[in-house]
């Protein structure tokens, strides 16, 4: 916008264009600027460069001494040369932020057909005026003001890149490397200049800056240097429109005169032709990127505002919760407070970093202004003013943030104090609850101790009763054995019959003995006679033996002849064969006997297994029978007690008169007695059903076995006086007696069956 104001002293004819009305409206509605006149050395340099470009010289044959002399002569002035006396410092009512600005506001020139599609005549006139060195036409030419905002490189006819400024000495190059202006947000003064694009691509100059890569990391903390999301590789820190041609807006690129120049570069117009469609595309892309920057800044402010607002940690009223829940709520609140404190510290650090960066930028701007020659004073002054406005904007933003942080800190301190009070109250309530809980625990422990004592007493009683039952059981077993050993009537009759039979047999044997004695005498006489005969026979045998000896002698004489040994060998062979056959037969018989013995052993083992199983079964039956006996005894004892209690209850009922109301003590005792009788009756019924089920071979009911009963409401005192209640209880007792009789018969039948099976197995 500074280039679009009119100079009051110079009356230069300007070129009219469709967008000039818009620029005049924006300048009249906005703030009034007094733009300084460009100094003569800078203007002569601009005209010199343009004349070189018009002549078509490639600057190859030209020496660098003339250019260096001009530059040195222009830089011979003091380092910070003030502007002319008749030019005032531009002043304006600067807005604190450009976030709310849009292309439709008066300070910004809208992009439309009037600004995007410029006539070729206006472009040609502006180009001619620039080449002739008349810089006064710049304030009326919309395309030329845009051209001054961009420095783009173009390739000449001979393929050598051109530069606007000549080469300088080594000291200037080193000083140029020390300072790079960061990319800043576009302000009100830059918005109109950035939206007014110069449409002639022949006058775009490529400005080579080798330090742009190093300056990217210097101002990363500033919100203007952040990369917009979704812009891709097009939006960089050096500006929203950095492409291959190097076109950068003035507010978003380093200063033009501070980069390292190349000695072989001269300014020369580009041979490319002008295309309206390309200009419209550039306008649209630039407009979109500016909108992206604005939206990004708005989002950052909204995020900073949202950070300062935090809801209350506790509600107005606290619900009644358990101590564990209160502790968890307190822990979460403490965690939130710690997070908020960390966030506040981070914001403070960020603000301090921003302040440091602003101070560094101010120092760099002042050092750059003091170290630059006079021809760059105008551009640097404009840049300094823009940076000062940015500085005021950042200071205002810093003040807002500090105020918001202080308010938030006060709110957080209030919430912290309230939460501490609530924590104190919760702790007190927790202490009271813990005391009550400890008292209840002590009471429960005392109750448990009393119950343990009662249980121990009951266990001792149960042990005594079990010992008594064992003694009784042993006595019963001894009596049963004694009764089993006693003979019965049948045994006595059998023994008497056997005695009579044995007496008859003894008489018969006596008679036989007499007969045998007589026979013995007769046989003795016969034996005597036979002995006499034997003696005679012995004598004859002696005679025969003598005769045999004589015969043997004769036979020995005959054997000498040779026929006797063969006959004897044949006889011995026959005897050997017969004996061998006998041995084989005996061996076969032995094998048969062995197989029979093995089969018999197997049968014996099987019989032993079956006998063992029968013994185990008999033992199990004996144990079951023993249990049944003990259960029957217990039932009989309990039945007897129940009958006695029933009789006493009947006596009490008879003694009680129906007309006169009973005393409260007797009524209470009667009620307790009735309750005890009802519980005993229920227990007896349960035991009876369990024993019956076991006797029948079924599994018992676990609820009855464990003594689990359903909750029953006790009978009131009025129920005892009703005859229906008494009749119902009597019916239950009679039914219990019948169950006991059935159980007794079942157990006796089972016992008889077991005894019969044991007798059969024995």
Curated annotation (Swiss-Prot):
Taxonomic superkingdom: Eukaryota
Pfam families for the chain: CC4_CEP85
Entry GO CC: cell cortex; centriole; centrosome; cytosol; Golgi apparatus; intracellular membrane-bounded organelle; nucleolus; pericentriolar material
Phosphoserine modified-residue sites: 17, 126, 141, 623
Stretches with biased composition (Polar residues): 14-26, 98-111
Gene Ontology molecular function terms on file: identical protein binding
Entry keyword set: Chromosome partition, Coiled coil, Cytoplasm, Cytoskeleton, Nucleus, Phosphoprotein
Region (Disordered) residue spans: 1-26, 94-119, 443-474, 541-570
Positions in coiled-coil regions: 334-657, 723-750
Chain intervals for the UniProt region annotation (Mediates interaction with NEK2 and is required for its function in the suppression of centrosome disjunction): 257-433
GO biological process: cell migration; centriole assembly; centriole replication; chromosome segregation; negative regulation of protein kinase activity; regulation of mitotic centrosome separation
Composition bias, Basic and acidic residues: 443-455, 463-474
Quaternary structure and partners: Homodimer. Interacts with STIL (via N-terminus); this interaction is essential for robust PLK4 activation and efficient centriole assembly and for PLK4-dependent cell migration. Interacts with PLK4; required for CEP85 to be able to drive centriole duplication and cell migration.
Role, per record: Acts as a regulator of centriole duplication through a direct interaction with STIL, a key factor involved in the early steps of centriole formation. The CEP85-STIL protein complex acts as a modulator of PLK4-driven cytoskeletal rearrangements and directional cell motility. Acts as a negative regulator of NEK2 to maintain the centrosome integrity in interphase. Suppresses centrosome disjunction by inhibiting NEK2 kinase activity.
Protein family membership: Belongs to the CEP85 family.
Full protein name: Centrosomal protein of 85 kDa
Organism classification: Eukaryota, Metazoa, Chordata, Craniata, Vertebrata
């Amino acid at each position: 916008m500074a280039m679009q104001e009119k100079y009051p002293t110079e009356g230069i004819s300007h070129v009219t264009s469709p967008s000039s009305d818009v620029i005049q409206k924006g300048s009249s509605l906005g703030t009034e600027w007094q733009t300084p006149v460009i100094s003569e050395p800078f203007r002569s340099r601009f005209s010199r460069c343009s004349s070189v470009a018009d002549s078509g010289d490639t600057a190859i044959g030209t020496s660098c001494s003339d250019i260096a002399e001009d530059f040195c002569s222009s830089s011979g002035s003091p380092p910070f040369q003030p502007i002319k006396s008749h030019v005032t410092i531009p002043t304006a009512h600067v807005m604190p932020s450009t976030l709310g600005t849009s292309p439709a506001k008066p300070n910004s020139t809208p992009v439309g057909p009037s600004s995007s599609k410029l006539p070729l005549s206006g472009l040609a006139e502006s180009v001619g005026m620039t080449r002739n060195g008349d810089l006064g036409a710049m304030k009326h030419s919309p395309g030329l003001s845009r051209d001054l905002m961009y420095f783009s490189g173009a390739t000449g006819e001979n393929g050598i890149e051109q530069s606007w400024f000549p080469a300088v000495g080594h000291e200037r190059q080193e000083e140029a490397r020390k300072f790079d202006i960061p990319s800043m947000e576009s302000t009100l003064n830059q918005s109109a200049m950035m939206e007014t694009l110069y449409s002639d691509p022949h006058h775009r100059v490529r400005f080579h800056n080798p330090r742009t890569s190093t300056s990217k990391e210097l101002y990363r903390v500033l919100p203007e240097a952040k990369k917009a999301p979704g812009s891709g590789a097009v939006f960089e820190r050096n500006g929203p429109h950095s492409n291959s041609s190097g076109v950068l807006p003035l507010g978003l690129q380093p200063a033009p005169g501070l980069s390292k120049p190349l000695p072989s570069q001269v300014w020369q117009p580009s041979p490319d032709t002008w295309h309206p469609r390309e200009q419209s595309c550039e306008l649209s892309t630039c407009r979109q990127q500016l909108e992206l920057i604005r939206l990004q800044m708005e989002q950052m402010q909204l995020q900073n505002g949202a950070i300062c607002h935090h809801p209350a940690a506790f509600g107005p009223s606290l619900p009644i919760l358990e101590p564990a829940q209160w502790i968890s709520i307190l822990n979460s609140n403490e965690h939130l407070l710690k997070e908020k404190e960390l966030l506040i510290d981070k914001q403070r650090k960020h603000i301090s970093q921003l302040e440091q960066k602003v101070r560094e930028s101010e120092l760099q701007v002042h050092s750059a202004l003091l170290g630059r020659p006079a021809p760059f004073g105008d551009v640097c002054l404009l840049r300094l003013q823009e940076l000062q406005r940015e500085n005021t904007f950042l200071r205002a933003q810093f003040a807002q943030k500090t105020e918001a942080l202080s308010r938030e800190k006060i709110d957080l301190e209030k919430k912290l104090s309230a939460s501490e009070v609530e924590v104190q109250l919760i702790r007190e309530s927790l202490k009271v609850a813990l005391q009550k809980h400890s008292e209840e625990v002590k009471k429960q422990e005392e109750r448990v101790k009393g119950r343990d004592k009662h249980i121990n007493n009951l266990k001792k009683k149960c042990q005594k009763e079990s010992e008594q039952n064992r003694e009784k059981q042993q006595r019963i077993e001894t009596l049963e054995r004694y009764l089993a050993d006693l003979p019965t009537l049948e045994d006595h009759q059998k023994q008497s019959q056997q005695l009579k039979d044995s007496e008859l047999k003894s008489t018969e044997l006596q008679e036989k003995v007499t007969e045998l004695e007589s026979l013995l005498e007769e046989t003795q006489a016969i034996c005597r006679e036979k002995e006499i005969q034997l003696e005679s026979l012995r004598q004859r045998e002696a005679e025969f033996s003598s005769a045999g000896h004589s015969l043997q002698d004769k036979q020995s004489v005959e054997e000498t002849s040779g026929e006797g040994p063969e006959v004897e060998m044949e006889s011995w062979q026959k005897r050997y064969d017969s004996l061998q056959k006998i041995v084989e037969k005996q061996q076969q018989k032995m094998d048969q006997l062995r197989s029979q013995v093995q089969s018999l052993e197997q049968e014996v083992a099987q019989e032993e297994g079956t006998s063992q199983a029968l013994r185990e079964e008999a033992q199990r039956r004996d144990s079951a029978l023993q249990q049944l006996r003990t259960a029957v005894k217990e039932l009989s004892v309990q039945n007897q007690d129940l009958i006695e209690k029933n009789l006493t209850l009947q006596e009490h009922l008879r003694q009680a008169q129906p007309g006169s109301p009973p005393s409260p003590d007797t009524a209470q005792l009667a009620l307790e007695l009735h309750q005890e009788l009802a519980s005993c009756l229920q227990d007896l019924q349960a035991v009876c059903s369990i024993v019956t089920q076991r006797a029948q071979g079924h599994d018992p009911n676990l609820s009855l076995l464990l003594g689990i009963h359903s909750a029953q409401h006790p009978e009131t005192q009025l129920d005892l006086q009703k005859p229906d209640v008494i009749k119902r209880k009597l019916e239950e007792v009679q039914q219990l007696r019948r169950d006991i009789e059935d159980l007794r018969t079942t157990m006796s039948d089972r016992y008889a069956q077991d005894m019969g099976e044991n007798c059969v197995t024995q």
